[in-house]
Curated annotation (Swiss-Prot):
Name of the gene this protein is made from: dnaK
Induction (free text): By stress conditions e.g. heat shock.
InterPro entries named among the record's database cross-references: ATPase_NBD, Chaperone_DnaK, Heat_shock_70_CS, HSP70_C_sf, HSP70_peptide-bd_sf, Hsp_70_fam
Source domain of life: Bacteria
Taxonomic path: Bacteria, Thermotogati, Deinococcota, Deinococci, Deinococcales
Designated name of the protein: Chaperone protein DnaK
Length: 629
């Protein structure tokens, strides 16, 4: 059976892992790194993913996409504020969805995330020596139904069979508790690049049971970065009367500098942010520079409200689990943003415990996802592990007066299924529209609409007579399926989903084909680059041989030099057929030259030996020795 992998598709960085000998192991990428930046850049027909994309971001800000996870499965009206601070163009798409415009083309967030997944899987396949198709992908525990579906679709667009979508804190708990014995109540505090989750689990005898989960999908390390960006921009504006945030290139440099400063302040009390030539004076065209010193105290002042926001989900998770802080045995920190000293301090204040830092906050989620993949595939080394998760938000339907009728409360164990009977409000009503909602507010307008389901073909009956059976079914991925039928007549009617933020089946199929075509184009482009590089490397070797074998026959040297010169011109021309011809000519010239050079050296060696022998003969002196007495 081919290996399955676990993937942490993160806001800022992503990680892939698999089971090796009963233990989860991170798979390094093609660059040799254990984490891959969740960054995708578009340059003409070429797509760059990971560190190579991040490195060129400042020069290509409009087409370098990052933090796309913040937009996946979201409605435009939910992300306007976040969209406005990006150096690239984020806009409203069909049905109120989100689209990212790059070089005149609109991309769905799922497409961009699929590029990251494709890179992770391609690199892992190369490392493992086998093609990977099966994966468990993690999502923040507080992701709603649309965001989970969109993440699953991203996997499908990348050509993956998504075995399961699991919550990030739950995955981290799997990694933490895999080899631990005894019973524990664990609080996982997961503050990543773009989202924040708190999950409380009970661990014991191979059972990982989630008691409660809470979170904030609009809070993460990028928000802390943004406070530094705004501070730097305001400081610069006061001095030069120019807002750097309006210049995409300058904004990209600010974002990168802010992230570096935040990381440095985790280990230092202050840091210097230096950005020479950040922009030009619009009147004099002289270069302007930015240099500021940021202290840890100032950073905590800038982010004070964000730090306060991490408290409420912890308190809510404890309340929902009906536990107090003293009932928690261990506090596990997950996500790179938990390295911020103020965050650690707040966690300790709330829980009264020193956080357990035994797991790598960047890798724990992917490692746990790999464990889940192993469980699904029946890895004998794992034994009997049972994972019991919950749905993070209440699911319900809209009823008369714009109220919400809850169907499945938050923190219900999944999979879960619930059926309720509804009826009509008017006589002879031919159909009903069922609005499916997710959230905790009592009024429908204040919650997220997951979709509108129309049940049509109800026979004419007085109001209140029809019995409309609505069933909510949440699968193990936390994804909701809704069915409805009219019981009185015994007839069933079809349901169609309208106005959802996720892609329909035809969109996914189209994007899968596009991704496959892009992958083929990328392969051909990579082959062209490799051929060009191989020819150039051979040219350098040829010049080296000419340097080392100066005593070789002149005609052989001339032929090799001419072939090397043609190779140089072919590389510059970028003409495939010319490159192939030049490669053959240079290989042939190299063989001929090496043969001629060896023959020449052997002849020289032979002549040298003969001369030496002659000398020995010439040096013989005839002499009569007088015998010793």
């Amino acid at each position: 059976m081919p290996k399955a992998v676990g993937i942490d598709l993160g806001t800022t960085n992503s990680v892939i892992a698999t089971m090796e000998g009963g233990r989860p192991e991170v798979i390094v990428n093609a660059e040799g790194a254990r984490t891959t930046p969740s960054v995708v850049a578009y340059k003409g027909d070429e797509r760059l993913v990971g560190q190579i994309a991040r490195r060129q971001a400042a020069l290509n800000p409009k087409a370098t996409l990052f933090e796309v996870k913040r937009f996946i499965g979201r409605r435009w009206d939910e992300v306007k504020e976040e969209a406005a601070r990006m150096p690239f163009t984020v806009k409203e798409g069909p049905g109120g969805s989100v689209r990212i415009e790059v070089n005149g083309k609109d991309l769905a967030p799922e497409q961009v995330s699929a590029e990251v997944l494709r890179k992770l899987v391609a690199d892992a396949s190369a490392k493992l020596g086998e093609k990977i198709t099966d994966a468990v992908i993690t999502v923040p525990a507080y992701f709603d139904n649309s965001q989970r579906e969109a993440t699953k679709q991203a996997g499908e667009i990348a050509g993956l069979n998504v075995l399961r979508v699991i919550n990030e804190p739950t995955a981290a708990a799997l990694a933490y508790g895999l080899e631990r014995k005894g019973n524990e109540t664990v609080l996982v505090f997961d503050l990543g690049g773009g989202t924040f989750d708190v999950t409380i689990l009970e661990l014991g005898e191979g059972v990982f049971e989630v008691r409660s989960t809470a979170g904030d999908t609009h809070l993460g390390g990028a928000d802390f970065d943004q406070r530094i960006v705004n501070w730097l921009a305001e400081e610069f504006r006061k001095e030069h009367n120019f807002d750097l945030r309006k210049d995409p290139q300058a904004l990209q440099r600010l974002i990168e500098a802010a992230e570096r400063a935040k990381i440095e302040l985790s280990n230092a009390s202050e840091t210097t942010i230096s950005l020479p030539f950040i922009t030009f004076d619009p009147e004099t065209r002289t270069p302007l520079h930015l240099e500021r010193t940021l202290s840890r105290a100032k950073f905590e002042e800038l982010t004070a409200d964000l730090l306060r926001r991490v408290r409420q989900p912890v308190e809510q998770a404890l309340a929902d689990a009906k536990l107090s802080a003293s009932d928690i045995d261990e506090v596990i920190l997950v996500g790179g943003s938990t390295r911020i000293p103020a965050v650690k301090r707040i966690v300790k204040e709330i829980t009264g415990k020193e956080p357990n830092e035994s797991v790598n906050p960047d890798e724990a989620v992917a490692l746990g996802a790999a464990v889940q993949a192993g469980i699904i595939q029946g890895d004998a080394n794992l034994g009997d592990i049972v994972l019991v998760d919950v749905t993070p938000l209440t699911l319900g339907v809209e009823v008369k007066g714009g109220m919400v009728a809850p169907m499945i409360p938050r923190n219900t164990t999944i999979p879960a299924k619930k059926t309720e009977i509804y009826t009509t409000a008017e006589n002879n009503q031919p159909g009903v529209e069922i609005v499916v909602l997710q959230g905790e507010r009592p009024m429908a307008a204040d919650n997220k609409s997951l979709g509108r389901f129309k049940l049509e073909g109800i026979p004419p009956m007085p109001a209140g007579r029809p019995q409309i059976e609505v069933t909510f079914d949440i699968d193990a991925n936390g994804i909701l399926h809704v069915t409805a039928k009219e019981k009185t007549s015994g007839k069933e009617a079809s349901i169609r989903i309208e106005n959802t933020t996720t892609l329909d089946k035809s969109d996914v199929e189209r994007m899968v084909k596009e991704a496959e075509q892009n992958a083929e184009a990328d392969r051909k482009r990579r082959e062209r680059v490799e051929k060009r590089n191989n020819l150039d490397s051979l040219r350098v070797q040829a010049l080296g041989q000419l340097e080392e074998n100066q005593s070789a026959p002149q005609d052989a040297k001339d032929r090799l030099k001419a072939a090397a010169d043609e190779a140089e011109e072919a590389v510059r021309s970028d003409d495939d057929s010319r490159i192939e011809r030049a490669q053959k000519q240079l290989e042939e010239a190299m063989r001929s030259f090496m043969t001629a050079a060896q023959s020449g050296s052997q002849n020289q060696a032979g002549q040298g030996a003969q001369t030496q022998t002659g000398r020995q003969e010439d040096d013989v002196i005839d002499a009569d020795f007088k015998p010793a007495e």
